[in-house]
């Protein structure tokens, strides 16, 4: 009977945990639906910005923001987008693993999300700056603050290169870590769509210098939004799997409990019958 009591306690514990994971799954699903509406608009916005800047860059020969494909890199700033909360499957670990695979000795981290801060601190990797007030309500204004800081770091030559590592959203069950180089822009890697030359007033060089903040802002805003929707999709999947596993475990424990209970009852009946036979 003591073992039966332990099994009953275990069943109740599994049932309670399943209720929690199911609730977390529903919350993640609600957040996923909310932020998914922003993804299409964000993709369209970022695509338009890329297209515009490709046209501008096609007419710029020399700029602090442009480099040849064989440029030398001594120090890179890695912007790493993680979540603030856990329980989201491999969402954070996949991004951090990709960073570690490419990190060089002098490189530093710009951590977005408290999980990125704690991870790279534990690895004793220098964190240049951090932002943790990131959620599904991330706005273009918040992106501008980050963008302005990054732009200043690059113009002041604190880093030769700035890259961002985020989670690319493909669909509700597929998302993968990806890297985008923000600076320098390598002209040979761009795809120019307009065959006809566009005339800029004032010249393209001046327009690039005056509007480069729009370019970097679009990248920051777009990657954070895409990472946010990937985070919620990953958490929903993780909690759904946890709930299903919990229900399966509960079923197995219930069968085990019922078998042991039946065995205990059978044993008690046998003892009663044996006692009655002995008296007769």
Curated annotation (Swiss-Prot):
Bilayer disposition of the protein: Peripheral membrane protein
Keyword Disulfide bond: no
Record keywords, A-Z: ATP synthesis, Cell membrane, CF(1), Hydrogen ion transport, Ion transport, Membrane, Transport
GO terms, molecular function: ATP binding; proton-transporting ATP synthase activity, rotational mechanism
Location in or out of the cell: Cell membrane
GO biological process: proton motive force-driven plasma membrane ATP synthesis
GO CC aspect terms: plasma membrane; proton-transporting ATP synthase complex
Pfam families: ATP-synt
Membrane spanning residue stretches: none
Primary subcellular site in the record, as a coarse category: membrane
NCBIfam families tied to this protein: ATPsyn_F1gamma
Family: Belongs to the ATPase gamma chain family.
Protein role: Produces ATP from ADP in the presence of a proton gradient across the membrane. The gamma chain is believed to be important in regulating ATPase activity and the flow of protons through the CF(0) complex.
Assembly information from the UniProt record: F-type ATPases have 2 components, CF(1) - the catalytic core - and CF(0) - the membrane proton channel. CF(1) has five subunits: alpha(3), beta(3), gamma(1), delta(1), epsilon(1). CF(0) has three main subunits: a, b and c.
Protein name, entry field: ATP synthase gamma chain
Upper classification of the organism: Bacteria, Bacillati, Mycoplasmatota, Mollicutes, Mycoplasmataceae
């Amino acid at each position: 009977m003591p073992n039966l009591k332990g099994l009953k306690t275990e069943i109740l514990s599994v049932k309670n945990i399943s209720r929690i994971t199911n609730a977390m799954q529903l919350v993640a699903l609600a957040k996923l639906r909310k932020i998914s509406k922003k993804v299409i608009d964000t993709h369209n916005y970022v695509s338009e910005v890329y297209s515009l800047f490709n046209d501008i860059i096609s007419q710029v020969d020399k700029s602090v923001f442009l480099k040849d494909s064989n440029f030398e890199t001594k120090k890179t700033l890695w912007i790493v987008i993680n979540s603030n909360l856990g329980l989201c499957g491999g969402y954070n670990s996949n991004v951090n693993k990709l960073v570690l695979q490419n990190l060089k000795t002098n490189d530093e981290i710009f951590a977005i999300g408290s999980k990125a801060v704690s991870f790279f601190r534990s690895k004793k990797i220098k964190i240049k700056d951090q932002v943790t007030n990131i959620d599904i309500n991330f706005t273009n204004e918040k992106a501008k603050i980050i963008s302005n800081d990054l732009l200043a770091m690059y113009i002041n030559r604190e880093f030769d290169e700035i890259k961002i590592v985020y989670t690319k959203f493909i669909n509700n069950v597929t998302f993968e870590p990806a890297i985008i180089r923000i600076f320098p822009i390598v002209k040979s890697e761009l795809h120019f769509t307009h065959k006809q030359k566009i005339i800029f007033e004032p010249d393209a060089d001046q327009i690039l210098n005056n509007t480069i903040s729009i370019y970097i802002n679009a990248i920051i805003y777009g990657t954070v939004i895409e990472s946010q929707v990937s985070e919620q999709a990953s958490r929903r999947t993780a909690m759904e799997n946890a709930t299903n596993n919990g229900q399966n475990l509960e079923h197995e424990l219930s069968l085990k409990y019922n078998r042991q209970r039946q065995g205990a009852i059978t044993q008690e009946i046998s003892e009663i019958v044996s006692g009655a036979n002995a008296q007769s």
